[in-house]
């Protein structure tokens, strides 16, 4: 019975420290392997139009970070793959499940991307399973990420269809309102859903949504994630593609969900919203701070690398980390 499993979210968990075995936090290794490739951090900026564009994708790839390019400028995807490969960089793109995407995937045989993410809101669907099989038939060497899902059954079905990784999270993101509009989702219990799904997984799990602090990255890894997709923490940078807005002398960046009317261009099946975030410096500074905080997490875990985070004990204390404070 589902109701027998513990239900909690990021703010309800504290990880319990172990004896530190490194002399400096800088010795902690935050690298992660996904498919045939190693990356500096187990984080992925969300593949959303206000988070990533081709310039940021190139920057991330050159600096050794993983990225997933969004699918909302469909005609630019093949030229993007070509441009990345000409620079000796990996190409990581997104596709949907509409009929014309099948022809697009087949057309990639001559210049095959290393990663393809099947990106739809409700990933436990026959349409996603069919697309996984099509990609694996046409492009067998491509690493396929599929999502989004929220149950062990979904993880097993997508893995059995050929997915190399599944993306877990239905509506926990800051600009996602799926749980309000539909009554469904993992909002409010995303970390427990991750734990539930990871126990069923044989391949990589990507936690997607609900990350509000850098410590949540360590918690995601503790509960089974190989990688963590993050939206709001990667939004609002000077180079972010979101529109810059000035309000009372302060600058803000637009940040909106992939299922918002601003993304769709129409008010139909809307499950996202738009917010303004204060502009917060450069993306590279955030990545550096994330790495330093994750190195500190590893030191508290008593290890030398990310694997040490998977074995720490934890306590569930409802809303304990804030204790009335804010950051």
Swiss-Prot record:
Top EC class of this enzyme: oxidoreductase
Keyword terms: NADP, Oxidoreductase
Family: Belongs to the IMPDH/GMPR family. GuaC type 2 subfamily.
HAMAP family in UniProt: GMP_reduct_type2 (MF_01511)
Name of the encoding gene: guaC
GO CC annotations, alphabetized: cytosol; GMP reductase complex
Enzyme Commission number(s) from the entry: 1.7.1.7
UniProt-listed Pfam families: IMPDH (PF00478)
Record flagged with keyword DNA repair: no
Chain's role: Catalyzes the irreversible NADPH-dependent deamination of GMP to IMP. It functions in the conversion of nucleobase, nucleoside and nucleotide derivatives of G to A nucleotides, and in maintaining the intracellular balance of A and G nucleotides.
Binding site for NADP(+): 205-228
Protein name as it appears in the record: GMP reductase
Signal peptide annotation: none
Catalysed reactions, semicolon-separated: IMP + NH4(+) + NADP(+) = GMP + NADPH + 2 H(+)
NCBIfam families named in the record: GMP_reduct_2, PRK05458.1
UniProt cross-references to InterPro entries, sorted A to Z: Aldolase_TIM (IPR013785), GMP_reductase (IPR050139), GuaC_type_2 (IPR005994), IMP_DH/GMP_Rdtase_CS (IPR015875), IMP_DH_GMPRt (IPR001093)
UniProt keyword Magnesium present: no
Active site: 176 (thioimidate intermediate)
Gene Ontology biological process terms, A to Z: purine nucleotide metabolic process
Entry's Gene Ontology molecular function annotations: GMP reductase activity
